[in-house]
């Protein structure tokens, strides 16, 4: 993760003269984003302004607006804005955000167990999401006010979901399993000139770069030269699974089951509720996927 090599998208943007602005409500050195995907970005703010996620996220929007306003008219720009308030279950104690009640006033993870009522915890989470939605709206309003929205691609997503014991196996938060509750996230793209559409087939974050590089930056290389994903708009030939990576093991998430693989190559077959699956068929695609991934992990 700390190879010092930036992501291919950032490299391509810089080569084409884009102004780069990174604004985060959380530190960029945990994980070491400053040494990986954002390596080489000048004036990269490692630490956020403000005390706590609520303040830091608000400052991220403020700093984005100041930065964008400082650019020369007509400048091409790429911005990455990361909000931490949802991750921290935080929101301002104001009536417009305290919509979901009753909510858990003070989180104590030691109280979580399989019989714990998730409703107040989930209500707090939803309130924090409402705050994040408000910040996103501020960004969109700014772009519209500056007459930039009609010529700017906006991608809204999340790095992971959060579970509230959805499958009654005492899993809470994220990073504990590969169920939809923890890995399925929203993806909303505002793309001027594109017709509105709902995509029903399986996609992943790995598909974003192969979507942007050819259409926005004019990349003519075959997708496999730089990514294991594929364009989000392409349905033909799409895999019927997505690859998800964890700290100690990875997963191939299929429509009706989850295939886990650890560092030693041992497989475990689970259903979508994280219980043993009756289907223990070894997927034919696994050897090819592992071989393909090794090209990017040398």
Language model features: what each stretch is:
Residues 22-24, 78-85, 126, 153-158, ...:
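Short beta-strand segments
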Residues 1-109, 116, 229:
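Active-site-proximal alpha/beta segments of enzymes that process anionic O-linked groups
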Residues 2-7, 119-131, 177-183, 194-210, ...:
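A short beta-strand-to-alpha-helix junction
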Residues 144, 148-192:
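Histidine-centered active-site microenvironments of extracellular/periplasmic hydrolases
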């Amino acid at each position: 993760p700390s190879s010092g090599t930036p992501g291919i998208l950032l490299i391509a943007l810089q080569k084409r003269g884009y102004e780069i602005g990174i604004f985060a409500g959380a530190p960029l050195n945990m994980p070491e984003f400053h040494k990986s995907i954002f390596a080489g970005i000048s004036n990269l703010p490692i630490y956020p302004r403000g005390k706590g996620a609520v303040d830091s996220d608000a400052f991220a929007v403020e700093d984005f607006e100041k930065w964008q306003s400082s650019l020369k008219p007509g400048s091409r720009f790429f911005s990455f804005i990361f909000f931490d308030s949802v991750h921290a279950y935080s929101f301002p104690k104001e009536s417009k955000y305290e919509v979901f009640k009753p909510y858990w006033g003070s989180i104590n993870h030691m109280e979580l167990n399989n019989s714990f009522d998730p409703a107040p915890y989930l209500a707090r989470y939803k309130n924090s999401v409402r705050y994040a939605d408000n910040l996103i709206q501020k960004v969109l309003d700014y772009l519209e006010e500056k007459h930039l929205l009609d010529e700017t691609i906006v991608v809204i997503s999340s790095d992971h979901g959060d579970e509230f014991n959805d499958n009654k196996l005492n899993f809470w938060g994220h990073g504990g399993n590969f169920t939809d509750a923890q890995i399925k996230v929203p993806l909303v793209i505002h793309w001027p000139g594109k017709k509105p559409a709902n995509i029903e087939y399986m996609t992943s974050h790995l598909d974003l770069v192969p979507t942007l590089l050819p259409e926005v930056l004019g990349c003519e290389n075959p997708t496999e030269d730089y990514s294991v994903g594929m364009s989000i708009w392409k349905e033909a030939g799409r895999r019927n699974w997505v690859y998800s990576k964890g700290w100690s093991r990875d997963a191939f998430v299929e429509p009706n089951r989850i295939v886990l693989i650890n560092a030693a190559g041992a497989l475990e077959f689970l259903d979508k509720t994280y219980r043993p699956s009756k289907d223990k068929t070894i997927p034919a695609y696994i050897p090819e996927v592992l071989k393909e991934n090794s090209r990017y992990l040398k």
